[in-house]
A protein has these predicted regions:
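Active-site-proximal segments of metal-dependent phosphoesterases and phosphodiesterases across multiple
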Residues: 81-100, 118-136
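Structured beta-strand-rich core segments of catalytic domains in phosphoester-bond hydrolases
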Residues: 1-89, 198, 227, 240-242, ...
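Short, glycine/charged-enriched secondary-structure capping and boundary segments
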Residues: 32, 91-92, 167-171
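Metal-dependent phosphoester-hydrolase catalytic domains
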Residues: 22, 55, 64, 105-289
Length: 289
């Protein structure tokens, strides 16, 4: 698995699209992992930050949305980490920085007051091309007691398999400073005291067993892409299944006419949990092991 020389010269980018008729964009933030790392007070004298991490241009995009109809607020994070298997430490530190920045943003968003004047946010429930529907007043904004109570979706190409340190940090909320993926390299406090985050994150596909792969080429197949969600605030209600196995027997790799990328699309549908009461768990049938 590698990158073409011309592609390597291109600055990395991520895009997050949302339905403007349904959601209000409250805030948007860009996280550049390399620039964020060198601005840390503990970066001074840490050569690995400058020699291995700072040169990488990978980013994450964070948006903070409010549902016009329900007033529920939530965060959506779209991230892309470094690809090279020889840089497991870089992927881990990018993940740690991502989780730190999301924590700061969510704590700040929890303090945001509700929108009082929603005249500009009135909406119509009519779909494009259908008969005109009456204009509806938006619901009152929901408030949250802490950042980890705000529903969170985090998706992207993490270039990390389920057994990696990056995956473990996201899924468990902590990672010791002596993890072998760090290779005893120095990244300030992140490599001195370990890494943590407060979110109860789960991979959406883990509820049925991770897919066999998300990246499929003739010489490389692995799980690199994920849709993470805060399990204390969100419930998985639907998932897009895996690629047909009979089709895969005839196709050695992607991209091709049917799959325009070597990464397959992941699709998940979520329901926001109420602050009280239980959500009935979806039945996805036999689990994949």
């Amino acid at each position: 698995m590698g990158m073409q020389e011309e592609d390597a010269k291109t600055i990395d980018g991520c895009a997050t699209f949302f339905k403007g008729s349904k959601y209000i964009l409250l805030d948007k933030q860009l996280i550049n992992f390399g620039q964020t790392a060198v601005r840390r007070p503990d970066a001074k004298g840490q050569d690995d930050i400058y020699n291995r991490l700072w040169q990488k241009d990978h980013i994450a995009v964070v948006i903070f949305l409010e549902n016009r109809q329900t007033g529920a607020r939530f965060m959506v994070v779209n991230a892309h980490l470094y690809w090279d298997p020889a840089f497991k430490d870089v992927k881990l530190i990018q993940t740690a920085i991502l989780m730190e920045e999301i924590t700061k943003l969510s704590d700040n968003y929890a303090k945001w007051p509700p929108c009082t004047d929603k005249t500009a946010f009135r909406f119509s429930e009519a779909e494009t091309g259908s008969e005109k529907a009456p204009v509806v007043e938006p619901a009152p904004s929901m408030e949250y007691s802490s950042g980890d109570q705000i529903p969170l979706l985090m998706c992207g190409d993490f270039n990390s398999s389920p057994g990696s340190a990056a995956y473990t940090l996201i899924a468990s909320g902590r990672l010791i400073e002596s993890h072998p993926d760090l290779e005893k390299r120095l990244y300030g406090n992140l490599s001195k005291v370990g890494m943590t985050h407060p979110f109860k994150l789960k991979s959406a596909y883990a509820s049925i067993g991770e897919l066999s792969f998300t990246n499929y080429t003739p010489d490389f197949k692995d799980i690199l892409d994920y849709v993470w969600y805060s399990s204390n605030t969100l419930h998985v209600s639907a998932l897009l299944g895996e690629v047909d196995k009979e089709y895969l027997r005839r196709v050695p790799g992607f991209p091709n006419f049917h799959f325009p990328s070597d990464h397959v699309a992941l699709f998940a549908e979520f329901t926001i949990k109420g602050k009280r009461g239980k959500v009935v768990e979806a039945d996805f049938g036999p689990q994949r092991h």
